[in-house]
């Protein structure tokens, strides 16, 4: 199967870190699970997580849980650079490590931190996906930039 055909079966996530959600965490996780299950029902087989705290990691954990339940799905972890999580709390670092360990593929988008590494990661995810599942609060920032990039590139966005 070529890259174009594989892209048609890939879905990525964009969303906020926990402190910027503006919605209860449990509600966000429930919405993510609903949209991921819907994407699986629509034929999506591979999910790409940008591995940030909050939406990205919760979505990755949901994908892994569904895979453990028997769904034939894969997880790609698209981390912006190695060591990205090093300044997080121990609890978030542990979650990050567990997801990375269980992923089907880990991809470091940049060799090291750079000012644009997060945007490059987000664009890479959109460029390799046919759908974006988003948790968006309307504020300026990386999530908005990712949604605008998806729109410019005609990649459909589902708001969870």
Please report, for each region that a protein language model flagged, where it lies by residue.
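Acidic/glycine-enriched connector segments
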Residues: 2-160
């Amino acid at each position: 199967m070529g890259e174009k055909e594989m892209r048609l079966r890939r879905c990525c996530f964009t969303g906020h870190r926990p402190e910027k959600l503006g919605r209860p965490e449990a509600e966000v996780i429930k919405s993510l699970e609903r949209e991921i299950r819907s994407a699986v029902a629509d034929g999506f087989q591979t999910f790409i997580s940008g591995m940030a705290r909050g939406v990205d990691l919760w979505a990755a954990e949901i994908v892994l849980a569904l895979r453990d339940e028997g769904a034939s799905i894969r997880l790609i972890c698209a981390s912006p650079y190695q060591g990205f999580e090093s300044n997080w709390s121990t609890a978030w670092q542990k979650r990050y490590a567990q997801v990375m360990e269980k992923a089907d593929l880990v991809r470091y988008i940049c060799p090291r931190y750079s000012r644009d590494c997060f945007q490059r990661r987000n664009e890479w995810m959109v460029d390799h996906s046919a759908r974006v599942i988003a948790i968006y609060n309307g504020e300026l920032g990386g999530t908005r930039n990712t949604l605008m990039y998806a729109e410019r590139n005609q990649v459909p966005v589902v708001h969870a």
